[in-house]
Amino acid sequence: MEKKLVPQSISKERLQKLEAQATLTPQQEEAKARKIEREKARLKELNIPTESKESKDCSPAGMINPYALTEVILERPLDWSNPRTTDIVERVLGSSMQDLSKGDSVLRAGRDQNAEVKIVDSVLTKTQRGQDGLERILESFNDYDMPPEEKEEAAPKAKKAAQKLDIDDLREQALSSTTITKEISKIILPTKNLRDDNNTVHQYREVGFQSNGAHNLWDTVVQGIAGDCYMLAALSAIAWVWPALLNMDVDIMSNQDEWRLYRYFIGRSKQTYARPSGSGTSTNEILQEGYYKVPIFARSRYWFNGEYWPALFEQAYANWKFPNDSKYNAILQIGGGWPEEALCELSGDSWFTSSGKLMLSSFTDLSLLNFMKSMCYSWKTIKPMVIVTPCWEPLPPMMPGIAAYHAYTVLGYTVSNGAYYLIIRNPWGVTEPTGDGVLSKRDWVIHFDNMKWFNLSKDDGIFALRLDKVRENFWYIAYMY
């Protein structure tokens, strides 16, 4: 059975030292108050409202990564860069990608604890899990063995495949946040029994430490099956701007191949599942599934090489929030939250604060451009910044490829042919918007005095969106300072 991840052997003196480092003196509290007043005055000069009445009906951000969920269901890694993988995701999750990006999709199942969830039969039989299940799905798409195509060419075939599955014509049969399969329910809903129908249990993989200490690898953060996009978008934002903040306390255990990481988090009263400041623990054991050892939760883009540092932060964060739960259940329960609060939680230092939600409806294209210029140096953000899509119903019209109830990282801005664009990263590590306003050419930002290239035509979750489209498709922007 699964092991529990609970705080172990951290000495009282060590914890007191961490608390002391994160606690401000009266003089520092005064300096922080002056800093906040200066920042408010700066935003006022830019004509940016710092206060807004927030709708009580708005939910926190929390969308599951559909590609990761599909891999865990099939127990088989997929090539996320292959356009036809979208067909597999739609088939397994029982919804088109357009429907999966909406607030009532299966990717938000479990967020509303008061909602009644209906369990239905899966399109996959018990014999269709793993290799056999994937091959049967691939065989159902007659054109899958054709050469890979660009997004523009693949989109019509993906739509045609969805029609074959009757997803568009029979929407009432599609999976949703309140209608899920037994297989999906066992994966994304907290449970005391982790055994499935095949009498298998979730596995562990021990990872080395050296390959998991490079916290400046901001573009390797990839979300798993937990709805914690808000935390991972914030993690990527800090790694992009201030990676030194992400150092962790290491304990080498009696067996030198084993170790634990301690991370001190700052309590934020406005966060979902608010907790007092304290430490969380992660181990070198990563949860996996199936013969191919598919990672279940957060991972690095290069997880197959043993790099899992985002998973270690996710474990520690979940352990801080839910110290008495199993590792699996704790991570599931951190789904849904506010990324601007997660920035401060992850910082480990009470000196930092959040800008709060700066509503994009209050910006014009010009004021948003001036704001970004004030927040960037050589096109790159100088403070960790996040951006969130609408989190209410009914949803406004949104571009294909942008998910509702989802948090993203802001990396900077750029200009092309006189038009200005925000450079944004999806913590899924895949899925970008398409259509008018998306910059699909090679462009750049400055990254630690080295030229860092973004291939904006590659589906790696990084995209550049024109300012007017940013205001139309996103709810608010926020940063930590």
From Swiss-Prot:
KW Protease (keyword) present: yes
Q: Which segments of the protein form a coiled coil according to its record?
A: none
Keywords carried by this UniProt record: Hydrolase, Protease, Thiol protease, Virulence
In the record, biological process GO terms are: proteolysis
Q: Which residues form the Calpain catalytic domain?
A: 169-481
Q: Residues in the active site?
A: 229, 406, 426
Q: Which domain of life is it from?
A: Bacteria
Family matches, as Pfam families: Peptidase_C2
Q: Which GO molecular function annotations are given, in alphabetical order? A: calcium-dependent cysteine-type endopeptidase activity
InterPro entries tied to this protein? Papain-like_cys_pep_sf (IPR038765), Pept_cys_AS (IPR000169), Peptidase_C2_calpain_cat (IPR001300)
Q: How is its activity regulated?
A: Inactive below 20 degrees Celsius and pH 6.0. Inhibited by divalent cations.
Assigned EC number? 3.4.22.-
Q: What does this protein do?
A: Thiol protease. Probably an important virulence factor.
Q: What does the similarity note say?
A: Belongs to the peptidase C2 family.
Identify this protein by name.
Answer: Thiol protease
